[in-house]
Amino acid sequence: MNHWLRRLLPIAAVLSSAGALMANQVGAMAYTSGSTGYDISYPQCGGPYPSGGFGIVGVNGGYPFVYYNPCLNDQYSHTTNAALYINTGYDPSYTQVDGKHSTAECVTQSATITGSSAHQAAWAVGCSEASRSIAYATSQGASSPSSWWLDVETGNSWSSTDLSLNQYTIQGIVDTLLRQAPAAVGVYSTAYQWRTIVGNLPVSGVLADWVATGSTSAGRARATCGTGFSGRPVWFVQYLHAGFDTNYTC
């Protein structure tokens, strides 16, 4: 993942609250406060691997849908306690059922979502982003991550006129991850970017924040452990060290 330079909506399928709680508990136990790890993706293809107690590997190639990390299998297999992150976004073109974007299955599921037809279409976009990312990760042998993370950044496409479309998209991703690949789900962003993309609109099912600090100082990054953006606890703060995105566990 490039560092920062580079409530409640209905869930489409019925989730077991006990199962979701178990996934969250398992995810929380996977990380030890004070430990450090890293995140890598397609920009690190062919390069050396950093060391750390855990790693978070990118599934996509910077954008949702048609771009994927060609080195996912190798990076995931070389990563201790590997988690996965997916790129996210919303654009009207993503609502097309064209074999690349929204899936017919997600569009069908979206009919159960309370909201306008545009909201349902946005939820289906998120559902499809998650489904296609899960399918690609599974095809690359990355099928049991310790947690899933949504990369929510302004560098990708989002609606600037109706933030609820972004909200429904993100909710669709979270709902689908919890249903198809049960594990803790968190969000990578900054307070500014999260506010720009979803404002104060709620997203349910998110367990934790992963904060991009843009800092090269571990000390300054650690000082932001109490400053999240979604209202959830901060699990990780990211900073740049020795050419790699490094993550400190709060």
PLM features per residue range, with description:
Residues 29-50, 201-250:
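Functionally critical loop-and-helix segments that line ligand-binding/catalytic clefts
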Residues 72-75, 98-104, 197-203, 222-226:
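Short, aromatic/basic amphipathic alpha-helical patches
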Residues 178-196, 207-213:
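Aromatic-lined carbohydrate-recognition surfaces of secreted/lumenal glycan-active proteins
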